[in-house]
Amino acid sequence: MQIKLANPRGFCAGVDRAIEIVNRALEVFGPPIYVRHEVVHNKFVVEDLRNRGAIFVEELDQVPDDVIVIFSAHGVSQAVRQEAAGRGLKVFDATCPLVTKVHIEVAKYSRDGRECILIGHEGHPEVEGTMGQYDASNGGAIYLVEDEEDVANLQVRDPDHLAFVTQTTLSMDDTSRVIDALRARFPNIGGPRKDDICYATQNRQDAVKQLAGESDVVLVVGSPNSSNSNRLRELAERMGTPAYLIDGAEDLQRGWFDQAARIGITAGASAPEVLVRGVIEQLKAWGATGAEELDGREENITFSMPKELRVRSLI
């Protein structure tokens, strides 16, 4: 069995920044540090931070007074921000800047009273945060659609004064079809010059298409609640290659590889490389050879840290 590695894979700039914010807050202020929602959707990362003193909660009413709170990379609604401010909580915002970009777009449509359509998955924390940027008191409304059927059934007030945005971690192919359906139904709809799916999601989906074409089985390292990791598995399967989403080497089943000569490995944007290395070592123990890195798009994007953590971490 030969191992092939997708390129790029694993951590993106937004995930790197979010994890580093929690780590630096722990270093500078000491535990406990409260984090609203899992800072990124990866079991290994969350457990590591929990062991260092991070406490993960789903709502601010689980947070005591006079503590530090970090908002996860997925972003939060304006109501959550207002609740934190009203309680005087010290907040560090680990929202991915590319998610913040979508928040700014939605807030602008809200101020203009322009109806907005969000393409995304119901219940995902990024979607909840983005929907929560819209203030309907200005006369508009925000709607959530997941697929073409939702578009066909959507009723809006003013079809000539619409705009759309997208969740950042969607399937590019699926989203393109939904956007086409929106434009067909609402010819005057506005939106970003390109969809809001982030560079890392696009790059990893392009890479897994290449990987699936050169593999008999594809392994996607990522947690089950990771949207972008699930999209990678689905994409490999659509390419006709069996694919499995795994948290790490402990999830591997030897029977998956009985008929496989080429095993492809990729990782979602919230999965650390150490987990990929663990998978490679287990496969090698079962007789796999090599670990060929496929050609791919180089990523050199970084996002800045909050000023207080940048300065105090140098003391």
Swiss-Prot record:
HAMAP family reported in the protein's UniProt record: IspH
Keyword flag 4Fe-4S: yes
Residues annotated to bind [4Fe-4S] cluster: 12, 96, 198
Protein name in the entry: 4-hydroxy-3-methylbut-2-enyl diphosphate reductase
Cofactor binding comment, as recorded: Binds 1 [4Fe-4S] cluster per subunit.
Positions contributing to dimethylallyl diphosphate binding: 41, 74, 124, 226-228, 270
Domain of life: Bacteria
UniProt KW keywords: 4Fe-4S, Iron, Iron-sulfur, Isoprene biosynthesis, Metal-binding, Oxidoreductase
GO annotation terms (biological process): dimethylallyl diphosphate biosynthetic process; isopentenyl diphosphate biosynthetic process, methylerythritol 4-phosphate pathway; terpenoid biosynthetic process
Binding site for (2E)-4-hydroxy-3-methylbut-2-enyl diphosphate: 41, 74, 124, 168, 226-228, 270
Catalytic activity: isopentenyl diphosphate + 2 oxidized [2Fe-2S]-[ferredoxin] + H2O = (2E)-4-hydroxy-3-methylbut-2-enyl diphosphate + 2 reduced [2Fe-2S]-[ferredoxin] + 2 H(+); dimethylallyl diphosphate + 2 oxidized [2Fe-2S]-[ferredoxin] + H2O = (2E)-4-hydroxy-3-methylbut-2-enyl diphosphate + 2 reduced [2Fe-2S]-[ferredoxin] + 2 H(+)
EC code(s) of this entry: 1.17.7.4
Cofactor: [4Fe-4S] cluster
Keyword 4Fe-4S: yes
The protein's annotated pathway: Isoprenoid biosynthesis; dimethylallyl diphosphate biosynthesis; dimethylallyl diphosphate from (2E)-4-hydroxy-3-methylbutenyl diphosphate: step 1/1; Isoprenoid biosynthesis; isopentenyl diphosphate biosynthesis via DXP pathway; isopentenyl diphosphate from 1-deoxy-D-xylulose 5-phosphate: step 6/6
InterPro entries on file: LytB/IspH
Function: Catalyzes the conversion of 1-hydroxy-2-methyl-2-(E)-butenyl 4-diphosphate (HMBPP) into a mixture of isopentenyl diphosphate (IPP) and dimethylallyl diphosphate (DMAPP). Acts in the terminal step of the DOXP/MEP pathway for isoprenoid precursor biosynthesis.
Record family assignment: Belongs to the IspH family.
Enzyme superclass (EC): oxidoreductase
Catalytic residues (positions): 126
Gene: ispH
A Pfam family this chain is assigned to: LYTB
GO MF terms held by the record: 4 iron, 4 sulfur cluster binding; 4-hydroxy-3-methylbut-2-enyl diphosphate reductase activity; metal ion binding
Binding site for isopentenyl diphosphate: 41, 74, 124, 226-228, 270
